[in-house]
Amino acid sequence: MTSSSAEQRLRDLARLRRVRDRIDREYAQPLDVEALARGVHVSAGYLSRAFRQAYGESPYSYLMTRRIERAMTLLRRGDLTVTEVCFAVGCSSLGTFSTRFTELVGMPPSTYRRLAAEATAGIPACVAKQVTRPVRNREAPAGAPSLA
């Protein structure tokens, strides 16, 4: 790799990191790939390809994973309904939220909310977060869900 191509690769990685940081910060806001790409002055197609190559998933998939992780935390608290959690994490469709949640976690959000309260009772929040962290896309076990 030549010096100029290595420098370009570092610039591209820094750009992708800015996109990922923005998703982490603004997950609850309406975000789409086009807006993220405009923010770093590249095309949406280029951003999607480069992001997938660097992080192993598309920007949209990464965004939804962050939203579902936050939703899991809110559902474990138990003081919000599934609909309130859906909108609190930036999803505008309860159906899409429930489908994606089920894909990542292996059970519907309403079931998770009920079981999480029972399964994490008495466990410190920092440990519960690690134990109940979602798996990546479409890797949820097909069998019975287990929270611990």
Which functions belong to the PLM regions below?
Residues 1-46, 53-54, 58, 70-148:
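Alpha-helical bundle regulatory/interaction domains
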Residues 61-63:
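Short, basic-rich loop-to-helix N-cap that marks the start of a DNA-contacting helix
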